[in-house]
Amino acid sequence: MRARDVTVASVRARIVVQVSKRRLTFFRRGRRVLTTTVAVGSSATPTPTGSYYVNQRLIPSDSGGPFGPGAIGISAYSNVLTGWTQGGPIAIHGTNEPWSIGRAVSNGCIRVRNPVLRKLFASTPAGTPVVILR
């Protein structure tokens, strides 16, 4: 690979998820823009901790389905759900179960309220860092 074939871009946003507090914070240019309560993985299917990045976006055909209006795929994979592709990709997504927000009930994904998902979807390009803390 030649240097002239590569474009380097900086990302000015980041997401930090605190699993134990069930909280997601979105930062832009080092400033906190949004803090919200989230649903996280259950004890049987925990949300994996570590440093990841946004790698895809999904807009389902049915915005009333389990992902709500969309999903932000991140580079994390479940260590428990081995039956899914490559161990179960993890995402930040909306929900059709708003009662679940604030609980440890997901299969490892991070659920947010649908209006929050829309804001994040518009503000987190591919490569955005996502740090998931215990």
Functional labels for PLM-detected ranges:
Residues 1:
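Short, surface-exposed polybasic-aromatic patches that bind anionic ligands, especially phosphate groups
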Residues 4-14, 34, 42-51, 58-134:
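Exported/periplasmic cell-wall-interacting domains
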Residues 30-32:
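Residue-level signal for glycine
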